[in-house]
């Protein structure tokens, strides 16, 4: 499920209009991916218009097994994709690793 203007962050899975990623960045990943005030290429590379399933995450989500299962229990309230099709570019993954951030693709290919 997706629409033309909605995109899902490939790192955290939050769903927002593309304009929101450009204007405000990602509420969870901005310090890592720097969407805000960046060129559209960063948003194009690190978000996907193709995603499946929706989960609404509220303010008090610590007890939610769904939030824990999707690994979004520490993220800000909003709509999240269950699955985000696509993967971050290798250069972005390398930058994340330099910051000691482990990237788990949200496309279903990661195994625990």
UniProtKB/Swiss-Prot annotation:
Localization, UniProt:
Nucleus; Chromosome, Centromere
Where on the tree of life does the source sit, at the highest rank?
Eukaryota
A GO molecular function for this record?
Answer: RNA polymerase II complex binding
Listed under GO biological process in this entry are:
filamentous growth of a unicellular organism; mRNA processing; regulation of DNA-templated transcription; transcription elongation by RNA polymerase II; transcription elongation-coupled chromatin remodeling
Q: Name one GO cellular component term.
A: chromosome, centromeric region
Q: Which UniProt keywords apply?
A: Centromere, Chromosome, Metal-binding, mRNA processing, Nucleus, Transcription, Zinc, Zinc-finger
Does this UniProt record's set of keywords contain Ribosomal protein?
no
Zinc finger (C4-type) locations? 9-29
- Which SUPFAM superfamilies does this chain map to? RNA polymerase subunits (SSF63393)
Q: What is its main location?
A: nucleus
Q: Which Pfam families match?
A: Spt4
Main role? The SPT4-SPT5 complex mediates both activation and inhibition of transcription elongation, and plays a role in pre-mRNA processing. This complex seems to be important for the stability of the RNA polymerase II elongation machinery on the chromatin template but not for the inherent ability of this machinery to translocate down the gene.
Stated family: Belongs to the SPT4 family.
- Self-association and partners: Component of the SPT4-SPT5 complex. Interacts with RNA polymerase II.
This one is known as: Transcription elongation factor SPT4
Organism equals Candida albicans (strain SC5314 / ATCC MYA-2876) (Yeast)
């Amino acid at each position: 499920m997706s629409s033309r203007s909605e995109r899902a962050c490939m790192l955290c899975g939050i769903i927002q209009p593309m304009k929101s990623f450009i204007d405000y960045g990602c509420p969870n990943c901005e310090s890592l991916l720097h969407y805000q005030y960046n060129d559209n290429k960063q948003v194009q590379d690190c978000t996907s218009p193709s995603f499946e399933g929706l989960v609404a995450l509220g303010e008090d989500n610590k007890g939610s097994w769904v939030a824990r299962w999707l690994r979004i229990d520490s993220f800000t309230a909003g709509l999240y994709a269950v699955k985000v099709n696509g993967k971050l570019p290798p250069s972005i993954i390398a930058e994340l690793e330099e910051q000691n951030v482990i990237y788990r693709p949200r496309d279903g290919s990661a195994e625990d």
